[in-house]
Amino acid sequence: MIRLGAPQSLVLLTLLIAAVLRCQGQDAQEAGSCLQNGQRYKDKDVWKPSSCRICVCDTGNVLCDDIICEDPDCLNPEIPFGECCPICPADLATASGKLGPKGQKGEPGDIRDIIGPRGPPGPQGPAGEQGPRGDRGDKGEKGAPGPRGRDGEPGTPGNPGPAGPPGPPGPPGLSAGNFAAQMAGGYDEKAGGAQMGVMQGPMGPMGPRGPPGPAGAPGPQGFQGNPGEPGEPGVSGPMGPRGPPGPAGKPGDDGEAGKPGKSGERGLPGPQGARGFPGTPGLPGVKGHRGYPGLDGAKGEAGAPGVKGESGSPGENGSPGPMGPRGLPGERGRTGPAGAAGARGNDGQPGPAGPPGPVGPAGGPGFPGAPGAKGEAGPTGARGPEGAQGSRGEPGNPGSPGPAGASGNPGTDGIPGAKGSAGAPGIAGAPGFPGPRGPPGPQGATGPLGPKGQAGEPGIAGFKGDQGPKGETGPAGPQGAPGPAGEEGKRGARGEPGGAGPIGPPGERGAPGNRGFPGQDGLAGPKGAPGERGPSGLTGPKGANGDPGRPGEPGLPGARGLTGRPGDAGPQGKVGPSGAPGEDGRPGPPGPQGARGQPGVMGFPGPKGANGEPGKAGEKGLAGAPGLRGLPGKDGETGAAGPPGPSGPAGERGEQGAPGPSGFQGLPGPPGPPGEGGKQGDQGIPGEAGAPGLVGPRGERGFPGERGSPGAQGLQGPRGLPGTPGTDGPKGAAGPDGPPGAQGPPGLQGMPGERGAAGIAGPKGDRGDVGEKGPEGAPGKDGGRGLTGPIGPPGPAGANGEKGEVGPPGPSGSTGARGAPGERGETGPPGPAGFAGPPGADGQPGAKGDQGEAGQKGDAGAPGPQGPSGAPGPQGPTGVTGPKGARGAQGPPGATGFPGAAGRVGPPGANGNPGPAGPPGPAGKDGPKGVRGDSGPPGRAGDPGLQGPAGAPGEKGEPGDDGPSGLDGPPGPQGLAGQRGIVGLPGQRGERGFPGLPGPSGEPGKQGAPGASGDRGPPGPVGPPGLTGPAGEPGREGSPGADGPPGRDGAAGVKGDRGETGALGAPGAPGPPGSPGPAGPTGKQGDRGEAGAQGPMGPSGPAGARGIAGPQGPRGDKGESGEQGERGLKGHRGFTGLQGLPGPPGPSGDQGASGPAGPSGPRGPPGPVGPSGKDGSNGIPGPIGPPGPRGRSGETGPVGPPGSPGPPGPPGPPGPGIDMSAFAGLGQREKGPDPMQYMRADEADSTLRQHDVEVDATLKSLNNQIESIRSPDGSRKNPARTCQDLKLCHPEWKSGDYWIDPNQGCTLDAMKVFCNMETGETCVYPNPATVPRKNWWSSKSKEKKHIWFGETMNGGFHFSYGDGNLAPNTANVQMTFLRLLSTEGSQNITYHCKNSIAYLDEAAGNLKKALLIQGSNDVEMRAEGNSRFTYTALKDGCTKHTGKWGKTVIEYRSQKTSRLPIIDIAPMDIGGAEQEFGVDIGPVCFL
């Protein structure tokens, strides 16, 4: 583009115009001329087709460019008429005075448009055809003077013009001069004076430029262009009409046995069955009408204050867990072809801020900062809740009398006084006459729902309904991730051109194409850069010598140079993003024992241990030292208002106030008297039966019906042909550990252990009594053959054999097995904490501790039975008048009035005193999971719970360290001696076997040593409330309550007999074992025990050197036992023998010293109530207690004497009018209670009414929240648990998308599903929902086998489900819960095929090539076989190879919800170049 400042633009134009003038004399048709818009221009001609565009003819090429203006440096620039660039108005100012010297040539004026200033551009019209060339126009009028240009360089000397007559002096003009007139001095087309030999005169002024001529004729037709590249294949057209039937095939082989026939007709109903178990409790009934508010209950007795718990010490913060290991590197990508080096682009705009990086590890603690400046006082806090009323203060001293006040103004009229108390009841009048019969009462309320009727007989099965019409095509699923590039497909047939799509984004720059044929002349392009200087024209006649010119401007830029050598290598690029993680490798061999990991996350709390023995009460601790003085507390909240001060003097009367805001809506008026009930209407005559209605339109296809009852057992089919062996399945996950097997026989004797350290020499035992002579044993039988020893180590390698001949080349091998496991990985991070193990068995009892000190005073005994009430005493004398009592508490509220309309929510009231505990409400649903709080300080240990039922046997623990030797058991019978095998070398490790069948329960293992105490885990989430447990035992003794007020002295009771000793109470539950006490002092040597039974045979010592065999002597009698020899060396440690039977109990040892007092045991259950004790002596009266709570109003006392009449009150304000018609009937009563008394009795205090409105609003809001929890609405904020729940709560809602949260808790992991409200099914969408249609698998092997799409095919994937926005594992967790909450699941998938069999092979007439599908628990479902693992085909369009796309719809239903959803599919009939497939995955639905 040419970029010109307003003033500089003239310089370039002057040059260009000069070039024009040089060539004006040449022939118009000479070579190198240009044709544009029907007008021919000579080589090097310059012209402006529009005010902001300039063109030059360069050896036959038209080069045009836009003039780019620079902004002038002034406030209000203006664009002169016909110009392109704005200039400052100062440049337009006229200069007065004489005509100045002639300026340099200016830019040619543009006189094309004299209409007005430039308008805004209009919308682009369609391009018109080129018009025919117009005639040359007349010369245009003189253009408006252009702005003054800068001094141009001297032009090339022009041809001398004819001499003009001298002109008269001109008028004063613009300072720029009339450059149009100056330009007229050049030659135009008709000026040829130099060639005619006319004498040259001075150059005349240049004439104005003529208007443009009419448009030229259209250019010649261009050559035919190359054919375009073939278009993209069009979208598949709709399926064509069904072709004509083919010729009849050969008769097929005998088919396989047919499927079982339809169910037979329904049998007669069976006999009445035995009564069933009680049904599960019914659903809660419909919410009843809101009851009227009940009367206020009596105030409950104050509960005993609970013992204050000890505050636990706060736990230490756990150390941060180790950072997870880095993921495995993905496979290395294939190297792409090197791209051509691109030119450096312009710097882009700075990109948007990237997402925040991952949170870095926490930095080390910084140094403590200097104390900041004192902050400004904060804003006054909101008023805190009103504190509980303080205890009444001591009465103050009377104040000194104040000065007499000035007499006040008369006060305003008081409010009318409250109605006086009711007078004494009058004497009963005589009975009245019976009244007239009353009008019928209003309609009674509907009775409660009747009990549920018994279930009816099952109905006869209905007939199968028609198949519904095909549903509408579902919405397109979300676009899947781009698959891997497929192999190049065959060239498709030429598609019809599609409609024009929207303009796509610009593609990358393609490689240059071959040179095309020349096209038609296009529209004028944007102005090009000035071309190179053309070749010199023919030499003209020599002109006269001109004035020497100034040195010329630098020439136009030269041609582009050759491409330079490649630059140096650029700087290292940024590290690319991590590749996608590679497929999981097979598990490597187990790594070496890693270093001990950091302590794992705290496990879940183990089950509650058995109750320990009750400890003794500990001593009371000493009082702690006083703590340091605390920092001054924060300013307290504003205290409650003080008591009202004495009345001030009355102020002057204020001005009339503005009207107050409208009050709350008043309470509803008293109900009117009931209207008379209408008479009972007569029964209407039954109408005639209507004519049958027209047949309705065909309904939409119904949703799949519920699963029908199973059909009758079909006949046994003939045995099917043996199936082809399936491919090896993937290695199964390790099965769960079976229960421990029965105790195996003792193993072979182990290798000798290292020699143990010498034990402490035991005291020498007493010599045992001589044992009786045993009977002679029979010689033992030959032992059975010993077990085969393990295989020996491999022998040494043999010598190399001779080299064999070269064999023939083998067939192409199948895909190799997976490679060897990679090198051992680094030690993994510590695994998550396991669940807590079962509680260890009780430890050995510790030595008995010392006698503890006396315990604290025991609990008070249960109160004795109530004695009979004494007779009332005689009336005492009247006491002295007491001091005036404190102001009584507010009386009890009257009966609740009818509820008024809800007022606006008032400000929150002060906190009321807590009411008595209500009965426990039904358990609410779990609320949304709160944000995890900080760990609280550990609570105090709870009281031990009741003994739980025995837990399931735990897994066998590692054997603990050996316990102390048990007492020797009696010897077992002599076993048969086996031949001792040699100890074999260990065999090579076998492959992992399949899990065995569960063995019988093993005997319990040895007692393990108690494990180290784990760190305290964070509190688990609050579980759902458990069932109400049995009543707990009484708590510990409470701290003594404040002294109550002294009771009235009772009459002294008669002294009772002494009661009998009560029955012994049930023993308390054993407490937890105390920690072992310190060892007591050694007791005195006990008496010698009786000889113990003979112990079992000790392990054999090491074999001695073999002696020479002596001759066999006769069997001698058993000799007497010899003297005890010296202690031999310790033999090798034998294997632990079988557990001996427990020995007889030894004699009790001496009483050990008392151990220290154990912790206090749980309180035992209360014993039976003992008989009353004797009356104690009267106690000293206690101190006067604080005044008790205000008692209930007493009964109305007897009527007092009438008081003296009071002074008359001021007249009250006029009352509102009342419509007495409502009460007209009330005045006509003769007797009976005042009917208005109920209206008056419940007039609420105005303050109470204000309070009630706020309470009502709060209750209403709470009620709404609770209602939304009890009856969720399926929104994201308030998701349901399943669609079945939604259907139960809102049966009228329509099917559609809703949110569910099966695992409850926090709603952030809720997922959107489709709820079928007709059936209650919950349907989860797959993500993605389609497998693109293409050739996924190529194989040259003739052997066909099933190939799993997600596991084996390149680019395949396992199907996943749920919202793609959720964290990866969230949907799996939610699906697990959804499966648990459901009893049946179903899913459809559609297999799109091209030359691939999906279900039935029509040619072979069997299902051998049918797909396999894999459920989420890795079970494979097939087309035939066990009916529990077979799927059905709803539609089968893939039965033969046709070269066209077809589809088969497969459905799988099961009541084993763990098998759904489908996660993989394995076709068999694939692998050829023409064989393609794709899959549409339907949603999985659970009910």
Curated annotation (Swiss-Prot):
Propeptide cleavage-removed residue intervals: 26-181
Gene symbol of the encoding locus: Col2a1
Family recorded in the similarity comment: Belongs to the fibrillar collagen family.
Taxonomic lineage from the root: Eukaryota, Metazoa, Chordata, Craniata, Vertebrata
Keywords of the record: Calcium, Collagen, Disease variant, Disulfide bond, Extracellular matrix, Glycoprotein, Hydroxylation, Metal-binding, Repeat, Secreted, Signal
Biased composition range(s): Pro residues: 157-172, 208-217, 433-442, 1069-1079, 1199-1216
3-hydroxyproline sites (modified residues): P670, P907, P1144, P1186, P1201, P1207, P1213
Protein name: Collagen alpha-1(II) chain
Protein's job: Type II collagen is specific for cartilaginous tissues. It is essential for the normal embryonic development of the skeleton, for linear growth and for the ability of cartilage to resist compressive forces.
Gly residues: bias regions: 360-369
